[in-house]
Each structure stands twice: as structure tokens, then as C-alpha cells.
Regions:
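Conserved strand-to-helix beginnings and helix N-cap segments that scaffold or border functional pockets
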Residues: 37-38, 67-71, 98, 193-194, ...
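NAD(P)-dependent short-chain dehydrogenase/reductase
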Residues: 42-45, 141-143, 153, 165-236, ...
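Residue-level recognition of oxygen-bearing side chains
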Residues: 73, 83, 110, 192-196, ...
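C-terminal substrate-binding subdomain of Rossmann-fold SDR/epimerase-dehydratase oxidoreductases
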Residues: 14, 23, 204-323
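N-terminal Rossmann-like NAD(P)+-binding domain of SDR-like oxidoreductases, especially those catalyzing
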Residues: 1-186
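Short, solvent-exposed loop/helix junctions and linker helices
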Residues: 4, 106-109, 157, 190, ...
Length: 323
């Protein structure tokens, strides 16, 4: 098994699950400096000691560069893999505007294309691509179904949708067995330091006002990381060329989520309202019918329990948040 983006929030959880299930796992990560390396090192602390895990610290584009003779390093790493879980990406909706867009096209679009091309040449059993609910854009048609028209409202969402289309093209034209998964607002232990609940917990621990964009009445389908990992693993048996939503199974306002976070953490939140940011959507909610019927996917962890676990993890952080 190969996991790209293995040092990240979801990638590290997935690799741990695969190793625990008895698989040999090759993890690939460039340690992109979108957030401090110390967080990623902490994510990998257990895996580095695990039997059956090896790490390749290099970017996908660098690994894909051809040699004078023979396959690229990326092809060698992927050769004969039972599954390539492609989670590597440039994250963040709000940071994807302006000059930063080049980074997103390189990492999310071109990075996916070189993985798919290497998989085509190397002959892998399956490619599971981590997409995002951001591809849907701002819609009042809820819950969101996989066959809906996708009109993303951020450059990040555009790159994730483009990568989905590449997966479909490589399946249709070259027979590469791909599955694309649209993740809905993933949270839990190891959540990236730029993500909402992590930021909220930091502000609450430091006694500062937390910044909430919009009125707080916008809704999200929050999905606990263990449920996402379970869905990713099940996707190995998904229909080739298919797209699946992976959500938490409920729709909650941001204000409700903050009140729940207060309750489970024992801390109070001073909420400071900010203007809605470009690229943000009003509502998300996953239709899980296809994932339930094809994959047997059913989320197990509700928001209160999931936030309790994230709050407990945050209290144990040994990293200096501002590092």
C-alpha cells in the first residue's frame, strides 16, 4: 500500500490503520511548509517506530522526473502496489487565491496527473483519490449528491474537481481503476493548525476571542477522522471510476458546534464575528446513499464525542502552537 501525503492530518491516521491491519505501507510526503513541520513530525511519531512502514520524503513532481533509462522513482515506488491512496494536496480554501494559485495547480492538478501516469505504467490494483466537498460550491440543493452539477467557488475547489476529472479520464481511457472520495469538513485529533476547531481550541485555551467568519448560522457536515479513514479503506472495493461522498451524517450550524466545543472542553468561547471570506460556502451536507449502498459506509462518531476526543488531544499537545 502507498499513501501520499502521509505526514498530514488524515494521511497519518490512514497509514496507522493500514499498518494495524497488517499491510506494508510506503508513505510519501514532501513536508510542504504550509504549516510547521513540527506538527507533521508529531503525526508520524508512532509510524516511524512501526514495523511495516517506510517513509519517502520527496515531492511527487520531483519523484516523477524521468531518468535517462528506466522508470521514474515514482513508478518504482508504486510498482505492484495493491492500492495507492492519493491524499497529498495543497490544502486551504482561503489561501488559494492570487499568486498562490500556482502552488495549488502544481500540487493538486499536476501532482495528481503524475501519480495517475505512474500508476498506469506501474500497474497498481486501485487508486483512491481524496477529493473535497469544495467541488460542489455554494448550492441550496441539499443534501449534496455525487451526480449534482459541481460549481466550485474557490480556486482550491477548482483544482480538486480538475483532479477528480483526471481520475475519471485515466479510468476511461487507460483502465486505471480509480475511486474519488469527497470529504466533508474533517475534524479530530491532529487536525491541521489552520482548521476551525484547532483554531477555536487554541483561542479558548489562551483566553482570546475566536474568529468566526459569517453569522454562525452557516451549516457544515462535520466528519470525524476515524470515520473518514474507515470510508477510505472501504473504497478499495468501490466501483471503478465512481465518486463517493464521505460525511458525518448530520448538518450543524457553526454556532451549535462552538457551543458543543465549549461543553466538551470545559472552556468558554468569546466569539468575534468577521466578514465571510471569499471561497466560503453557506452550507454543506453529504448525501451518503451511494457510499452506504456500495461501500457499507456509515459514520459512527457523532459531533459531541468527536469534539471531546479532539479537545482531549489538544490538551496533550507538546508542540508550541505558534512554532
Amino acid at each position: 500500500m502507498v499513501v501520499t501525503g502521509v505526514a498530514g492530518f488524515i494521511g497519518s491516521h490512514l497509514a496507522e490503520r493500514l499498518v494495524a491491519d497488517g499491510h506494508e505501507v510506503v508513505g510519501i510526503d514532501s513536508f510542504e511548509d504550509y504549516y510547521p513541520r513540527s506538527y507533521k513530525e508529531a503525526n508520524l511519531a508512532g509510524l516511524r517506530q512501526a514495523r511495516g512502514f517506510s517513509l519517502v520524503e520527496e515531492g511527487l513532481l520531483a519523484l516523477s522526473r524521468g531518468r535517462d533509462q528506466g522508470p521514474s522513482r515514482l513508478e518504482e515506488l508504486l510498482a505492484g502496489a495493491g492500492c495507492v491512496f492519493h491524499l497529498a494536496a495543497q490544502a486551504g480554501v482561503r489561501a488559494s487565491w492570487g499568486q498562490s494559485f500556482r502552488i495549488y495547480t502544481d500540487n493538486n492538478v499536476l501532482g495528481t496527473q503524475v501519480v495517475l501516469e505512474a500508476c498506469r505504467r506501474a500497474g497498481v490494483g486501485k487508486v483512491v483519490y481524496a477529493s473535497s466537498s469544495s467541488v460542489y460550491g455554494d448550492t441550496d440543493v441539499l443534501p449534496m449528491r455525487e451526480d449534482a452539477l459541481c460549481l466550485p467557488v474557490s480556486p482550491y475547489g477548482v483544482t480538486k474537481l480538475a483532479a477528480e476529472q483526471l481520475c475519471r479520464l485515466y479510468w476511461k481511457n487507460h483502465g486505471v481503476p480509480t475511486v474519488s472520495l469527497r470529504f466533508f469538513t474533517v475534524y479530530g485529533p491532529r487536525q491541521r493548525p489552520d482548521m476551525a476547531f484547532h483554531l477555536f481550541l487554541r483561542a479558548m485555551h489562551e483566553g482570546r476571542p475566536l474568529e468566526m467568519y459569517g453569522t454562525g448560522n452557516q451549516t457544515r457536515d462535520f466528519t470525524f477522522v476515524d470515520d473518514i479513514v474507515g470510508g477510505i479503506v472501504r473504497a478499495v472495493d468501490g466501483r471503478d471510476g465512481a465518486v463517493y461522498n464521505l460525511g458525518g451524517g448530520s448538518r450543524v450550524t457553526l454556532l451549535e458546534a462552538i457551543r458543543t466545543l465549549e461543553r466538551v472542553s470545559g472552556l468558554s468561547a468569546q466569539v468575534h464575528g468577521e466578514a465571510v471570506q471569499a471561497g466560503d460556502v453557506e452550507h454543506t451536507w453529504a448525501d451518503l446513499t451511494r457510499a452506504r449502498e456500495d461501500l457499507g459506509y456509515t459514520p459512527q462518531v457523532g459531533l459531541e464525542e468527536g469534539l471531546r476526543r479532539e479537545a482531549g488531544w489538544y490538551r496533550t499537545l507538546e508542540i508550541t502552537p505558534s512554532r
